[in-house]
């Protein structure tokens, strides 16, 4: 709202005068006129071939098709465990010093 120096025919809105003689313009939001309905004359018809030409379609030629994917290979098989231990029986010799028993006897006496 405010005072405008434009001529009255260029103003959009409502013009009011205040008590001190100034003219004020209250700006309004211009509304659009409703749209007019479009009527086709009854002599104009659209044939099916023209209608099909206007709508996009998916290409169906063999050259544009996505190639078929071959089947996936089989999953890898689990490897056999390596033979870490041998099945050959080995005799183990134990070392037994003659004074080994005396060491344990002395500790037991404390």
UniProtKB/Swiss-Prot annotation:
The UniProt entry, under InterPro entries, shows: SMR
Tell me the gene name.
SMR8
**Record lineage:** Eukaryota, Viridiplantae, Streptophyta, Embryophyta, Tracheophyta
Task: Write the record's keywords in alphabetical order, separated by commas.
Answer: Cell cycle, Protein kinase inhibitor
Keyword Cell cycle annotated = yes
Q: State one molecular function term (GO).
A: protein kinase inhibitor activity
**A biological process term (GO) from this entry:** regulation of DNA endoreduplication
Q: What's the protein name?
A: Cyclin-dependent protein kinase inhibitor SMR8
User: Which organism was this protein described from?
Assistant: Arabidopsis thaliana
Subunit structure of this entry? Interacts with CDKA-1 and D-type cyclins.
Q: What does this protein do?
A: Probable cyclin-dependent protein kinase (CDK) inhibitor that functions as a repressor of mitosis in the endoreduplication cell cycle.
Q: In which tissues is it expressed?
A: Expressed in the root vascular tissue.
